């Protein structure tokens, strides 16, 4: 079988940074490009999977949790001047992009970054942004459209090379299914 990671690596080899626009799902990943000396970092459109980074001693330290960065001896733990307020809101309420600690930053939802090892430059790119559109449909058409979108999302999640199971909690999303 082909794991998601293997498919993602092949997609990156084929399309480069353009592969993230084709991804459907939640992800945060990095690809080291040996010949170019660059590190590619990407985060899913809604930011479900976090991705933090810090410049330290001419290197870029990155991980899915701030604790991973702080475990590195080159990443100091001092909190930013306004970070104390944010420590109380480490959930969805905190400021997007802020890593709370000095020199720790979070890649925003729908962004990818390219780190050049020889210059230490980190360039951020937005590949997706939620857009606002007029909604001219009536109630019945809206119900049909939402039903189609939910069915499509469920069918996409059922594609797997391993057995699939589900946990229905009784919340809004579970009740919808």
Predicted features, each with a name:
Residues 1-177:
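Cysteine-centered catalytic environments shared across enzyme families
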